[in-house]
Amino acid sequence: MITRSLIELIFSAASMERWNDHPRPATFTELGKQAHKMIMAWVIARYESEARGAPVDWTSLIEGGIFEFLHRVVLTDIKPPVFHKLMQNDEQRRKLNSWVADALAFNLHRLSPAFAARFRDFLLSEDESSLERKSLRAAHYLATKWEFDFIYHWSNTKSMFGIEQTRGEISRQINEHRDLRAVEEILAARELPDRDMGLWGFLSLVGQLGFQKRWAQTPRIPQTSVLGHLLFVGMMAYFVSMEIGACPRRRYNNFFGGLLHDLPEVLTRDIISPVKKSVEGLDELIKQYEKQAMEERILPLLPESWRDEIRYFTEDEFSGKIRPAGAKVPVILANDLGEEENRDSLDPIDGRIIEACDKLSAYMEASLSIRLGVAPQALADGKQNLYARFSRSVISGFPMGQLFDYFW
């Protein structure tokens, strides 16, 4: 069972500001950083797998990313230099990690006893040599560096105490991961005149979703970014997938489908539903433009062999689909996926689950702002309309409506 407090914990990361003791050109949040990190980890692990012919345990990578996210959210009050110092001491690290596992035991056990056990094992494990953990660690430092480059550019280095030391430490940590070919290529690409191309161009473009605010024309607190929203949707879709007994490939697709479903918005901005539906045919016109922009500007940044999967995640993103072996185009299903489609070989994805999690995010954004006293009519109407649509929703046997009931 997905508990209310677990959802609130995830969402709270949207209010956790990063670099809040530095001058910043924009607000960086923990939720946005972790989203960027997970997309980077996907790129690094996939590139490394293809370059070396080594398989990726995608369940381990996804859950490892979720575990590290939860760990960081619980320990958010510890500043990074202190946090990393504590992690270097074996005894303190074990005590701290055991405390985090205990703090989340109730919520994670309610979700899945096996998942809670894997969380504890992950935190207490001393083995960090797997491709999955190395990819996550490299992605962590690259996402940190992406943010820090803005901080550094904005700062007067003569006035900002310790900023050169911070810069050097981040560079040192990244250099420790140059044995991963994707990291080497990304770092090399950053220094080229055409650095907007290739993997670095893709990751930099994705990071810019952190600057796009949701409900941009509506007063609301806390403000949330499109980038942070993507991680919330991906994690919730993964948890629902666990609840319905989804096969590994279906869980993979639901997580990364949720994490990447709004990728076209980096080119079109987050256009609110009332605007899309205000003129007949406008929604379809926007979809056509997004598809064209993806083909012309985003997909060329990625290896050709990856592009069909990105299309699978971003086109008809709210439809249930399968991709049987040999099929030239995905098969869009009229109904929810059933047991017959719950097979890795069919590459299934639950678009309706991703849509419900997407709308749950919007519903929570409206509900929380109203609860905090910022309640323009647009938020009240949005909350009411979303609840009316999803309060009784059941998808593939999972009662999505109960998640909306939590925040009414």
Regions found by a protein language model. Name each.
Residues 1-408:
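Alpha-helical, largely C-terminal catalytic domains
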